[in-house]
Curated annotation (Swiss-Prot):
<dbReference type="InterPro" id="IPR001547">
    <property type="entry name" value="Glyco_hydro_5"/>
</dbReference>
<dbReference type="GO" id="GO:0030245">
    <property type="term" value="P:cellulose catabolic process"/>
</dbReference>
<keyword id="KW-0624">Polysaccharide degradation</keyword>
<dbReference type="InterPro" id="IPR050386">
    <property type="entry name" value="Glycosyl_hydrolase_5"/>
</dbReference>
<keyword id="KW-0119">Carbohydrate metabolism</keyword>
<keyword id="KW-0326">Glycosidase</keyword>
<keyword id="KW-0378">Hydrolase</keyword>
<comment type="similarity">
    <text>Belongs to the glycosyl hydrolase 5 (cellulase A) family.</text>
</comment>
<comment type="function">
    <text>Crystalline cellulose degradation.</text>
</comment>
<dbReference type="GO" id="GO:0008422">
    <property type="term" value="F:beta-glucosidase activity"/>
</dbReference>
<dbReference type="Pfam" id="PF00150">
    <property type="entry name" value="Cellulase"/>
</dbReference>
<dbReference type="GO" id="GO:0005576">
    <property type="term" value="C:extracellular region"/>
</dbReference>
<keyword id="KW-0136">Cellulose degradation</keyword>
<keyword id="KW-0964">Secreted</keyword>
<dbReference type="InterPro" id="IPR017853">
    <property type="entry name" value="Glycoside_hydrolase_SF"/>
</dbReference>
<protein>
    <recommendedName>
        <fullName>Cellodextrinase A</fullName>
        <ecNumber>3.2.1.-</ecNumber>
    </recommendedName>
</protein>
<feature type="active site" description="Proton donor">
    <location>
        <position position="141"/>
    </location>
</feature>
Length: 336
């Protein structure tokens, strides 16, 4: 479904309209036209734009036109440089995947849920007609298993309301445990044939997150070489097996919306991991979005940059730490 629309390999624009300080300086300058051109020149076919609800919606549910004007500019630049666009709602009123955010209550609060529906109806009115170029990602990384029942209900209602406005737009839908692949099986059957199951992959965690200080599952001082990890084609085949079978059962496809490796891993070992996981993605026709983007305070690298990607990106691994550590040439010409 996504491949037929030219959406196969993408890159994340995190830290711009989400996970940020919302300052005008950040919103005006974090990503510029040349950055979008560079992404296209690297050979990517789409970008993922995470947005937080407060970019486009006031607390009373009313529209913030400045936020939509900014999204309009991204749409225009993507069209100019031949890129497709995934609009990802990274945070909604009452919920964020980031436990450090002061958002809670979404799954039990009808007012928050109505704001979620209204927000997506507005996005659908503005962008839902451009079905060849724009995809909607309903919500980033539902966390707790306890939420899945209500999330199935909420997402189905929301998709139904979107469909009254934008009947043909593709919608990405993820499950709990932060869009884990093995929880796709607990999603309801797709609302219709234009819903794609979405998952994220940072596995095996002890390899991709080695040195991380934000998860109790990792001892920060421990290091692991690629050869000492579980990583293999067979490992990912098993990890993705229930997601693949669930998608096949319901006649839909899969999208991996985030994946990568932390910066302490060598470029060589990172490249090995990317090559293995991308081989499995390609085998099963899974489109994907690599979580590479720019550093918080500096510009995108040029094609001749000799620094590693870890020096020029922002993370989407929970804490804004960089994570894909190959050289630019390796990442953009070899891992895909």
């Amino acid at each position: 479904m996504l491949k037929s629309r030219g959406i196969i390999k993408g890159i994340n624009l995190g830290g711009w309209m989400s996970q940020c300080d919302y300052s005008r300086e950040r919103l005006d300058n974090f990503v510029k036209e040349n950055d979008i051109k560079q992404i296209a020149d690297w050979g990517f076919d789409h970008v993922r734009l995470p947005i937080d609800y407060n970019i486009v919606q006031n607390n009373d549910g009313s529209v913030i036109e400045d936020g939509y004007n900014r999204i309009d500019k991204v749409v225009e630049l993507c069209r100019k440089y031949g890129l497709k666009l995934v609009i990802d709602l990274h945070k909604t009123a009452g919920f964020s995947f980031d436990f450090g955010e002061p958002e809670s209550g979404f799954f039990d609060n009808k007012e928050y849920q109505e704001r979620f529906y209204i927000l997506w109806e507005e996005i659908a009115r503005r962008y839902g007609h451009d079905t060849d170029n724009i995809v909607f990602e309903l919500l980033n990384e539902v966390t707790d298993e306890a939420f899945i029942g209500k999330w199935n209900e909420i997402s189905d209602i929301c998709i139904g309301r979107i469909r009254k406005i934008a009947p043909e737009v593709i919608i990405l839908l993820g499950s709990y445990h932060n869009n884990a692949a093995d929880t796709v099986q607990f999603l309801n059957a797709p609302h219709d044939d234009r819903v794609v199951y979405n998952f994220h992959c940072y596995e095996p965690l002890k390899f991709t997150h080695q040195g991380a200080t934000w998860t109790p599952d990792i001892i920060p001082g421990e290091r692991m070489k690629f050869e000492d990890s579980e990583t293999s084609e067979a490992y990912f085949e098993e990890l993705f097996s229930t997601a693949i079978s669930t998608a096949e059962k319901y006649g839909t496809t899969l999208y991996c919306g985030e994946y990568g490796v932390i910066d302490v891993v060598s470029a060589e070992d990172s490249l090995k991991w990317f090559k293995v996981i991308n081989k499995v993605f390609s085998k099963h026709g899974i489109s994907r979005e690599c979580g590479i983007t720019r550093k918080w305070t500096s510009a995108f690298p040029t094609a001749s940059t000799t620094a590693t990607v870890r020096d020029t990106e922002v993370s989407v691994i929970k804490t804004r730490k960089a994570h894909n550590c190959c050289t630019l040439t390796e990442v953009f010409t070899r891992v895909y």
